């Protein structure tokens, strides 16, 4: 039976290996990103485990919304990983839902991500541009830039999503064009 729970410091090695395997050619980069992102004590990591083995992980990291009225503390859901042999069984969806519940309980108004709209829209995410949100980088394809509006969201909260500095340091924002 799969159990969802907060990530513990003792999970670090298993979570690192999970991201390394799940992200294939980009696994080392993503694993290093996770190592650095979790250094922020406001980051929220959740794991899915079965019989003591970590099968999935999601990380929610503080960011900002640069709204006309003021800066708004928000979160970014990134990354999400499930072991390849455990995918398509609802583990990733369960981790995302649990993460959104935790963010709502903390009074976070919006959670942003860049990802597959077909997957994340089923979990309550909407196109960011539809609510006046701007991508932090033009390298993020418009359809991939998504937001989950939580109960603390107010309509005046529009503007540019600002990733945590760690994403920029790892060059993990949007897609690079090798032919540019």
Regions found by a protein language model. Name each.
Residues 51-52, 85, 149-153:
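Short loop segments at secondary-structure junctions
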Residues 2-15:
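A short beta-loop-alpha structural element at the N-terminal edge
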Residues 134-179:
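C-terminal "cap" of GNAT-fold acetyltransferases
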Residues 70-84:
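Conserved acetyl-CoA binding element of GNAT-fold acetyltransferases
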Residues 86, 90-98, 108:
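Conserved acetyl-CoA pyrophosphate-binding loop and the N-cap/start of the following alpha-helix
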Residues 105-109, 115-141:
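Conserved active-site alpha-helix within GNAT-family acetyltransferase domains
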Residues 12, 20-66:
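Active-site rim helix/loop that mediates acceptor-substrate recognition in acyltransferases
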Residues 15, 19, 120:
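Hydrophobic pocket/interface hotspot
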């Amino acid at each position: 039976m799969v159990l969802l729970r907060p990530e513990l410091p003792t999970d670090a090695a298993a979570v690192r290996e999970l991201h390394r395997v799940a992200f294939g050619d980009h696994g080392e980069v993503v694993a290093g990103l996770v190592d650095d992102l979790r250094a922020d004590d406001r980051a929220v990591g959740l794991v899915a485990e079965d019989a003591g083995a970590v099968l999935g992980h999601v990380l929610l990291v503080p960011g900002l919304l640069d709204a006309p009225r003021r800066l708004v503390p928000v979160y970014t859901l990134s990354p999400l990983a499930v072991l390849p042999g455990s995918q398509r069984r609802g583990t990733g969806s369960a981790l995302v839902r649990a993460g959104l519940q935790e963010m709502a309980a903390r009074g976070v108004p919006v959670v942003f991500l860049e990802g597959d709209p077909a997957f994340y829209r089923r979990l309550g995410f909407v196109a960011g541009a539809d609510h006046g949100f701007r991508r932090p980088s033009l390298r993020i394809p418009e359809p991939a830039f998504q937001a989950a509006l939580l109960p603390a969201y107010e309509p005046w909260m529009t503007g540019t999503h600002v990733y945590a500095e760690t994403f920029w340091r790892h060059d993990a924002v949007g897609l690079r064009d090798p032919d540019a």
